[in-house]
From Swiss-Prot:
Its cofactor is Zn(2+). The keyword Zinc applies. Disruption phenotype: Inactivation of the gene does not cause any detectable phenotype in sporulation growth conditions. Deletion does not affect cell growth in rich or minimal medium. The active site is at E457. GO terms for biological process: peptide metabolic process; proteolysis. It comes from Bacillus subtilis (strain 168). GO terms for cellular component: cytoplasm. Belongs to the peptidase M3B family. It is found in: Cytoplasm. This is Oligopeptidase PepF. The lineage of its organism: Bacteria, Bacillati, Bacillota, Bacilli, Bacillales. It comes from the Bacteria. InterPro entries: OligopepF_N_dom, OligoPept_F_C, Pept_M3A_M3B, Pept_M3A_M3B_dom, Peptidase_M3B. The keyword Hydrolase applies. Gene3D superfamilies: Oligoendopeptidase f, C-terminal domain (1.10.1370.20), Oligopeptidase f, N-terminal domain (1.20.140.70), putative peptidase helix hairpin domain like (1.10.287.830).
Amino acid sequence: MKGTKGKVFRVFTAFLAFVLFITAYDLTKGSEKPEDIHNTSLLRNSCFFNWLESKKTRGITMAEEKKANQLPDRSEVKAEDTWRLEDIFPSDEAWNKEFQAVKELIPNLSKYKGKLADSADHLYEALTYQDKVMERLGRLYTYAHMRSDQDTGNSFYQGLNDKAGNLYTQAASATAYLVPEILSIEEDKLQQFILEKEELKLYSHAIEEITKERPHVLSEKEEALLAEASEVLGSSSNTFSVLNNADITFPSIKDEDGNEKQITHGNFINFLESENREVRKNAFDAVYKTYGQYKNTMATTLSGTVKKDNFYARVKKYKSAREAALSNNSIPEEVYDNLVKTINKHLPLLHRYIALRKKVLELDEVHIYDLYTPLVKDAGMKVTYEEAKDYMLKGLAPLGEEYASILKEGLENRWVDVYENKGKRNGAYSSGAYGTNPYILMNWHNNVNNLFTLVHEFGHSVHSYYTRKHQPYPYGNYSIFVAEVASTTNEALLGEYLLNNLEDEKQRLYILNHMLEGFRGTVFRQTMFAEFEHLIHTKAQEGEPLTPELLTNVYYDLNKKYFGDGMVIDKEIGLEWSRIPHFYYNYYVYQYATGYSAAQALSSQILKEGKPAVDRYIDFLKAGSSQYPIDVLKKAGVDMTSPEPIEAACKMFEEKLDEMEELLMKVKQS
């Protein structure tokens, strides 16, 4: 969605931008999963977009696959371990009754079409009526999609989900006139409307977000033509998605036990994590040999998407596709440049980490396929769900009593759907709507990763709780630029708590490695993605064809730069660009690195300053989209227009690397 059309969705459409907040955790962990998609947001708001894409991600492990048929039916799961969706609608009958009531309201959504410029009253009434309908529609959809996700084999709830989605489409169509018509009103007249009708001040920031796009809005006929062409212009991305997810198949290789096993998108990561190096290498070679057979097609689809991005930017009178993409959240381009420049400056830290990996794994040389096998085993760290709740409450205690009370409310009032059952969707997410509790989907396993996942998702949920409680409906959402800050701050606080309180040194090593890998995947890797993305958009804008050879060489050279001379950069990795769905969502991934860095800065302030930093942070959680993301973060204590947060995050990585090296030496000598 671009330009005017995008603003309809981002500013006013609750369904995408702020009614539903879903963040699939597996997609936010630095894309270390082979199906790394993000995702990720709003235009592509972090919520709904992540959820849709996550339907394709995160396979189950080989052991889990064997157990899949032993999972209980949904009806056999204890009620106390499920989310209490009855708090949204007490019954399916109540949902259907509300559905019919909202359906009858849809035709009136367009009753003010052609009348917004007539008076302040008409403008206000159109906006408030739209909000009331979309708020109710958001609750309908949230209930339906979560009922569907708890058992994807339940055709009744799949039907509810489809009905809610179709109703939303009707509502979106009926309100599509709003933004173009607001833009047709002269600025002086809009300001006069706001002055003469006090209630319109509620929408002043939202209207400002729309009107700042005036220089980039075309004539009505031109905008209509672009809208008509959007499906055609998006065909490259659709072709990639079908090819990558439906048509490409990988060969079989022998697993650790000598059994033939076919590689899939879902289990590729399990092969790469294998302790058997031959298994890792064979999986790596097989996957990239397969992608090599499709490199010409993949180059065509990626080139088509980049051309589309550059085309939209050009006709909308932006200097570049990057400026166009970042303008959606009013992010200065210097934020992007600061990230790339600062991370490049600190690449020796990544080189040092690779050297440590080589030493610990006792390898003569480190290859790309050696990056994923665990550096440190879990040291027997089995964590039950009950233990995880205790860890979470203690680890997040620095955020204060009010924050703790919200966590307890969520745990006690069944915000979390805890365990696996047959048909339940994979992964984890936080969801909800304005006027409902936040909800969390988990598929609990007794390990540290699930502990961090739970804390991560509660970060999103408490963020949503504060935002919806303290902001009116038009601002009861938040952009992806700040979304991952809240979840990652929680992870950082938990990590520090565990490091300070675990007595077993091997367990502390495991936590340190978890934190270092998180940084490598979320900051170093995503910044490399961001650098690649900008390079190919720039080359295409300058008229250079994006051939498979060019794409492969650019990507290979970036890997050489990022990983350094201490690592063998296998030629196959040059083809990784061909399987990354990120690159079809222009200028999106940099936000993972900036969000992670902001979270590290905020968590450090919270632990060092105490209450003043906590108060700023809670105000940040309450702000929603009432201000621009950059401004919200500045008030919290982090200025992302400067390199300082990235510098501070790199300093944290260095300190954790020091600590791990020292602890490894100590454990080895004991």
